[in-house]
Amino acid sequence: MMIPPRERKPRQKRITGFLIRQLFLMLLATVSMQAQVTLSDWTQIQIPPELTGNQFSPTRMAVNFFGDLYLLDEERSLIARLPADGDNVRIAGGWGETDELFTSGSDLTAAPGLDVLIVDSDTHRLLKFDRQLNFLEELNLLSTDRPVEFPSAVVRNHAGEVLVASDSEADLTLMNMSGTVISVMGGENYGTDRFVDINSVAINSINEIGLIDSDDRYLVLSRNGRMLWRGSLNMELKFIESTGNEWLVGTAKGEFFIVGQDSQAEVLQESLTQWTVSDMAVGNDTVYILEEGSGHIFQAQLRYAE
C-alpha cells in the first residue's frame, strides 16, 4: 500500500535533524581541538663550540626516546650526538664511500630504539650507528630485492623495519635491515594517490605511516601501504611527525597543525617563530626546530588542555 506523502514528512525531519546534529558534533569536535593544543615559549638549546661556526653546520635533526639530539651536516658529511644533558658530544662520519663515511647524507632517524640510521643519497647506502655513534654496519640499497636509488628519507618502525624514500622513483620501500623488501608504496598502482614529491615521512606508535607529498597534502597509510586517509592544507608543508594518535605537520615559516582523519587545527603558539625552519623533530611532547643557516636549535612543549 502506498504511503501518503504527508506521512513521510516526520521521517524526513528526523533524518534531517540527525544529519544536522552529526555535523554540529563534528564542528564542535574541531573547535574543541583548536583550543586544546598549544606550544609553550620557544627556548634556545645551548650548543657546544665544536658544533658551531666553521666546524659543523647542522642541516637535519632527529631525537631519540632519551632526548638525545642527532645532527647531520650534509656539506661536511658529519653526524653529531648532543646528549640530553649536554655533555660528551660526539662527532662521527666524514667524506667517503665505505663504512661510517658518506658523501651526501640526505636524512637520519633515531627513534624508536637505540640505533641511528643515515641514508647516503649519492652512494645509495643505508648506514647504521649505535646510540653513541659507533659505526655498526651498512646496507647497499642497490643490492636489495628491489633496488632503491638516491634515498631521500628514512624512518624505522617499532618492528625494526626500515622505510626508505626514493628521490628518483618518488615511492617508499619497506624492508628489514638485511635488505629483504617487504613492500613498495606509492607507485602507479596507487592511481591518483600516487606519490609525486615526498618531502617528509614519519611513523607512529602503531606503525602507521604519515608523509608530506607535493607540499600541500598529507597521506596516512597502514604498515603495508594501504591508504587510510588523506588531507591537505593551503600552504607549503615541509615536515610531519607523530604525536599520540595524530600527526603534527609544519611549514618552513614555523607554523604547526595537528591533523587527524576528520580534523585539522592550528597549534597556538605563545611566541611566534621569527626564523626559517630547516628541520623539525618531536620527542616526548617536545618539539625541536632547526633554524636554517645559523644552525640554532629551539624547543617548546606541546600542551594539551583537558
Give the location of each predicted region.
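Bacterial N-terminal signal peptides
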Residues: R21-V31
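Short loop/turn segments that connect beta-strands within beta-propeller blades
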Residues: P83-D87, D130-N134, N176-T180, S222-G225, ...
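A short helix->beta-strand "capping" segment at the edge of beta-propeller domains
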Residues: Q36-Q55
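Blade-level signature of beta-propeller repeat domains, shared across WD40, Kelch, NHL, RCC1
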Residues: W275-E306
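Beta-rich, blade/repeat-based domains predominating
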Residues: T52-F65, T98-P112, T144-H158, Y190-S205, ...
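A short loop-to-beta-strand structural motif that recurs across blades of beta-propeller domains
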Residues: L78-A80, R125-L127, D171-L174, R217-L219, ...
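Conserved beta-strand positions in repeat-built beta-propeller and related beta-rich domains
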Residues: L71-E75, I118-H124, V164-A170, N204, ...
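Short loop/turn motifs that cap or connect beta-strands within the blades
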Residues: I47, G93-W95, N140-S143, G186-E188, ...
